[in-house]
């Protein structure tokens, strides 16, 4: 497929960190996306953005579009409006991305022009029993196919993360209408479903996407984990992470003030992150150094309180990395860890 027939679009925001994330996303496409760098690139916003932001994106070859919000009850659903661009943009496949994704390699050869492409999610808050109830509520037949979630390997229906979507042009208009419709219906009825109410308004647009795909009987092709690799969680051993070399990573806003993607649990993936050159080298980024230290000592990513506190000490040179390591070793959390 020729890159000029691919449109890459994201739903941005005038607020940080989303504005900067939008810039990083398109910078990654231009730097590492190969043929994708020549694709049509559009950033959508549901509120006015600064001239500086528009200018920065234009320099990257990105057009900006102002879109109407879907519903004030769920700002995450505004991403659905990306699909409303089909009448003004010429493409064979729409690649819809969240702002907190980064392109590491050219994936154009893996785009299917005839099926919707998406990666199954790492978690499913609903579970099979609640999906049955939800499908019955909307008069839909529960799909027979079963997936396993990547984090805990629980069995569920084909339920997708919508941070990375490949949508063939013939499907875009109809999917847009159905996805939007199920979103509004879910927002109107969510209180009837305790498990949905528990997380409201999160996941609404993701549940509605799954309802739309199955309710609209669209052909879909599950993408591999390499096409939307989450860096914020530890995944099940069946995922065989050591064999993975991702095309796109989904950092879930885990990005340093200097523009470096924070580490995940897997060294082979972190080595891929080391190759991203947007700003200060990761080895000189205080937040990344603290994140590394947490992983080495506490075996988890740094929480925001610890990250901000220790990186500030490091940056101001009030404490060295060795000093901070000693502080962590003296903590109750470290002392409570099982010793190997």
Where are these regions (language model features)?
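Composition-driven recognition of low-complexity segments enriched
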Residues: 282-340
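Short aromatic/hydrophobic "clamp" motif used to bind/position activated sugar donors
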Residues: 94
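Short glycine- and hydrophobic/aromatic-rich loop-to-beta-strand nucleating segment
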Residues: 163-170
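Conserved donor-nucleotide/metal-binding helix-loop-beta segment in metal-dependent transferases, i.e.
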Residues: 103-139
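N-terminal anchoring/stem segment of glycosyltransferases
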Residues: 1-71, 89-90, 200, 275-279
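A short, glycine-/small-residue-rich helix N-cap motif at loop->alpha-helix starts
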Residues: 71-78
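A glycosyltransferase accessory/donor-loop signature
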Residues: 2-3, 152-155, 173-283
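Short acidic donor-binding/metal-coordinating loop in glycosyltransferase active sites
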Residues: 99-101
